[in-house]
Amino acid sequence: LIKLLYESKSSCRSLIEGNSFDGVWKDGQMGYAVWLKSVNQQGNCRWCRTTDVTFRNNTFRNVGAGFAFSGSPEVFPVDSALSRVLVTGNWIENINVQPYDGDSRPILLNVNARDVSFIRNTWTGGNFPKDAIIFDISNGIKAVTNFRFEDNVIPTAQYGVGATAVGEGTVALN
């Protein structure tokens, strides 16, 4: 069972650089290449957090979906939600192409992440029937504070930017 190519529930000051990630699909999860979050899974680790993470100059191929970032999505609280994440200079190709199917979204953000930046990345090839970027606010909590998206090449999919329960476009960014 392959759930994700890279996942962090608790890590600080991580640099993921110059790697080649290949092959993940919907099975145990929705096929995301990368999932970062701050998690206190059993209720005994309030200090568990994921902060100060950089993904730089990596290649991702044949994935069901791209990046999913969640501030603190679990029932048990953490002292610090996911924060200070930089994704820069990465190449992502063949999202949601059989047999590597999945959620199909290049970017999913939810549950109060902070200071998330995507700068100079390229997404190419794939099947994007949903939003290119989705802010999941279905639980009434802001998806992300201080989101930066600069100089990227990304397909528009059916919609460019969307937010659950709100819609697409400018309204999704507010």
Model-derived features with residue positions:
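Glycine- and acidic/polar-rich repeat regions and solenoidal domains
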Residues: 1-174
